[in-house]
């Protein structure tokens, strides 16, 4: 039929880059309770990777986002060329600036950015409780992982991006 486009699900080869020596670890306070009865009660966060090509050269972009479990909207997101602490800190600071009175349960995986002492201090100063997925249990951050999957299936997989600008525009 005209205008109908099929998408296929690609297998994931992603992984969380764990901190070799985490400075701070939190319990899984969220415990897969993905229902929130009000905005800003529970938030999830993660970073995902995208690739684009200039000639034969592969380049990467990283998208950090924070999702509100109440309505599954993205509260804050930042795109950068490096997956580093600055990416996550900027995403977090942007969310706090937009909703300074929010004090949600804040859940992430155990990636190196989230186990950083500086990040934990930022959460404490914002009046948020930190929660982390258990080791090797990406389902503990299921709605966030699901968001990435939908975004990539509908907008990214099956396409070849040939410039940074084209990829950023898609995101």
Regions found by a protein language model. Give the residues of each.
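Charged DNA-binding/catalytic regions of mobile-element recombinases
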Residues: 1-171
